[in-house]
Amino acid sequence: MSAPGPGQALFAFVRYWSRRPPVGDGEPAEHGRLVLAAEAVHALTLRGAAATVNAVAQEIGIDQSGASRLVKAAALAGYLAIGASEADGRQRQATLTSAGRTLLDQAHDWQERVFDRLTEGWSERRRREFQQAMTDLIERSGAPHA
């Protein structure tokens, strides 16, 4: 068997970083799910898309019922507000609350600390190139991003 190629490395990377904690994994897992809901609503809003339950489901790759529960939990936690869509009053859409923006600010700070820790010892140039390579892959895949 030959050494793994770059495609295999890419998919190992994706598998590793797409792991989700088990549903019953307690408070840290629930916090992560609430951040995921807030991130999805934020990304949709940045792109000018309505953050409906169906749009959130598509954004994070889960079914509609799972997205509905996720959005409801984030709203109950105070991170999202749910209201009628401006485009279609029959639809409900989510928006970030001030608590949701604070949650995202804290999550983004944590993400930067994790990146700093994982790339410790790398030159600033290597870090920027890696960031650009990840961004390029997202754009080439056709995946939406904020």
Kindly give the residue locations of the regions a language model identified:
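Helix-turn-helix DNA-binding elements, focusing on the entry/boundary residues of the two helices
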Residues: 52-53, 71
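Charged, amphipathic alpha-helical coiled-coil/dimerization segments
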Residues: 72-128
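Short, locally clustered residues in the helix-turn-helix/winged-helix DNA-binding domain
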Residues: 39-46, 108, 135
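Key DNA-contact positions within bacterial/archaeal DNA-binding proteins
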Residues: 65
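C-terminal regulatory/oligomerization modules of transcriptional regulators
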Residues: 1, 128-146
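The alpha-helix within a helix-turn-helix
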Residues: 57
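N-terminal leader segment of winged-helix/HTH proteins
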Residues: 1-35, 39
